[in-house]
Amino acid sequence: MKPPIYYPIAIRLAMPIYRYMVHKKSQHLPTYMREVKERFGQTYLPAPTAVHIPVDNLEKKVNKSGCHGRVIWCHAVSLGELNTAYPMLKILLNQGFNLWITSTTQTGFNRASVLFEPLLGTRVNHSFVPVDNLKTIQVFIEHIQPVMALFIETELWANTLYELRQRQIPAVMVNARLTEKSYQSYAKFPKLSTSMMQNLTAIIAQDEASADRFVRLGADKVKVSVMDSLKWSSVHQLSADNQRLIQQVQMWQGVSHRPIWLVGSTHDAEELLAIQAHKKLIEHDPATLLILVPRHPERFDEVASLCQSSTFITHRRSKGERIDPDTQVYLADSMGELLAWYAVCDVAVVGGSFVDVGGHNPIEPAALAKPVVMGKFIKNCEELVDGLSKVSALTITDSASQCLADAVASWLFDEDAAHQAGMAGRQLVVAKENAATKQAEQLLIHLSITDSTTNQSD
């Protein structure tokens, strides 16, 4: 179904503005020229064509006949979406497919470089997502020649979906979610939304409410299915570096026999809330330690200044400082180490949920058997929060320092209760960890149907 006539006109008019925005945001970055060329369809790296042995051994195999070397395009907006999709993408690699990853953000682009580093240039390549101009999209698709396109969670582009449909390339929305707020925004443009819904081959929603909203936007009900969120499978094994870090931290004199709580993936205002709550927890036990892990590296110095102004004795990971017996707040201002810090703490508070961000992934601490506390802004992870709450592994509290302190204290100073909650969460994660396998199998079914249809038409 063709997008309404106003959409391609609006995209063309917006392209100079978008180019300026890219310039303003990325001109100081080493990837700037590459980003400009890729977003506007000028130059791309070669498409992956190599055929390699599986990435790792998987217990469950499906027939890989005819899939070696074929490219699946996966669009993941940023770091979070790519982390979520990673277990499923590994399964597709193990089936013999190659991957082309696109990202909207710099953090997503950088994460792809890390996750797929050994395979880049052979079985995997990545780029910034091209602007949704029809000619640009045609250049991109012609270059990578995908047999399927995957869109992780939320971001869709009408011209892209139309071009994929014209080329009979299946387009699947994976781990799809649609909040009521997003639904209302899409519903303001009914013809545009209907065109996108109609041009999708399938929508794998992560909850019934999202599935219903997609249907109301114009998706055929038969195209929409509901499966457990990929986030249940998204906890990667601790890297060797993280395992070494855990061992090192556990040997530091300032760690043993102390109640430790952590606030991870924090955003502006959440660190102040944590520090205010920490003042109340220290009144209960002066040995209590707070570990802060900000979400964005550009805020590390800002958070450090906040901690130092609080009068708490603060040490920083980026300065090579350890947790000493007198450390009251430890700023883990590093990237790629969040899981290690979760492993060290007794109670985990997941950020992005005390301000209107939508909440980050509670599965990460739950998988490590840590009781979890979150705020009420959880639109990005409602299904996960509901599941963990039902087994009493997670509690929701208000964005007030006393409420946060009380919620943390109920586990931090009750070892048995914390252990019981942590194990309940861990058991739930284990029970649902095959979510990636199930969604990958669904994708392979759609591919086999497409192959069969293509062969018949030939």
Label for each model-derived stretch:
Residues M1-D458:
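Nucleotide-activated sugar donor-binding and catalytic core shared by glycosyltransferases
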